[in-house]
Amino acid sequence: MKSAILVFPGINRERDMARALKLISGHEPAMVWHAETSLPKGTDLVVMPGGFSYGDYLRCGAIAARSPVMDAVRAFAADGGLVLGVCNGFQILCESGLLPGILMRNARLKFICHDVHLRVERSDTPFTRGYNAGQVIRVPVAHGEGNYAADEETIRRLEGEGRVLYRYCSATGEIGDTHNINGAAQSIAGIVNVRGNVLGMMPHPENHVEDIMGCTDGRGLFAGLVAHLERAA
């Protein structure tokens, strides 16, 4: 799997993501500076990592979404290429129009930084094939603006089309306000586009891929991507 990690000013999770991708795919990802106008030849996966691109000025991800490299990302996605946006990357995907909705301030107006539980809603996508439908995984979050919001029609479409892949839940998989850490609509933690090749999610699976972290639940996402691409080759 040949992956490319986009690097914007203020991003700070690119090395975590690179370590996870290399560990699981066996290949060193390329680092692509935001001012580039093309992606490395043969790229299979584009990743937008977490951090605070451009200091989160204007809105989280708003400036990064207008970077030169994003035209290449849009073309890549339109051609069926896999795109993963984590945390600030999710915000950039929404601001760029690759995903619907927006990420707002957390409901309690506080930065959240701890492990959470997610329920995997489907196992038949490139981003979830490493899990079972209904499986509960534990991964970290670290955000102040992860409250997913969209108009009612968009939410209905996301639900009706099965485009919600991850939801905040309890350790046993229950969904509800008690377990919805940031107030996101329908406890949404991760969604895909209509075609299913672009995923945005607030939690950080890349930080739970090694035993030293005390949990390896994030491995399934990356292992599933590798398996999907190997099968498609």
Curated annotation (Swiss-Prot):
Residues 3-233 form the Glutamine amidotransferase type-1 domain. It catalyses: N(2)-formyl-N(1)-(5-phospho-beta-D-ribosyl)glycinamide + L-glutamine + ATP + H2O = 2-formamido-N(1)-(5-O-phospho-beta-D-ribosyl)acetamidine + L-glutamate + ADP + phosphate + H(+); L-glutamine + H2O = L-glutamate + NH4(+). One of its GO terms (cellular component) is cytoplasm. It holds the Pfam family GATase_5. Its EC number is 6.3.5.3, 3.5.1.2. One of its GO terms (molecular function) is ATP binding. The keyword ATP-binding applies. It is found in: Cytoplasm. Pathway: Purine metabolism; IMP biosynthesis via de novo pathway; 5-amino-1-(5-phospho-D-ribosyl)imidazole from N(2)-formyl-N(1)-(5-phospho-D-ribosyl)glycinamide: step 1/2. The active site is at C87 (nucleophile), H204, E206. Keywords: ATP-binding, Cytoplasm, Glutamine amidotransferase, Hydrolase, Ligase, Nucleotide-binding, Purine biosynthesis. GO terms for biological process: 'de novo' IMP biosynthetic process. It comes from the Bacteria. Part of the FGAM synthase complex composed of 1 PurL, 1 PurQ and 2 PurS subunits. NCBIfam families: FGAM_synth_I, PRK03619.1. Part of the phosphoribosylformylglycinamidine synthase complex involved in the purines biosynthetic pathway. Catalyzes the ATP-dependent conversion of formylglycinamide ribonucleotide (FGAR) and glutamine to yield formylglycinamidine ribonucleotide (FGAM) and glutamate. The FGAM synthase complex is composed of three subunits. PurQ produces an ammonia molecule by converting glutamine to glutamate. PurL transfers the ammonia molecule to FGAR to form FGAM in an ATP-dependent manner. This is Phosphoribosylformylglycinamidine synthase subunit PurQ. It comes from Nitrobacter hamburgensis (strain DSM 10229 / NCIMB 13809 / X14).
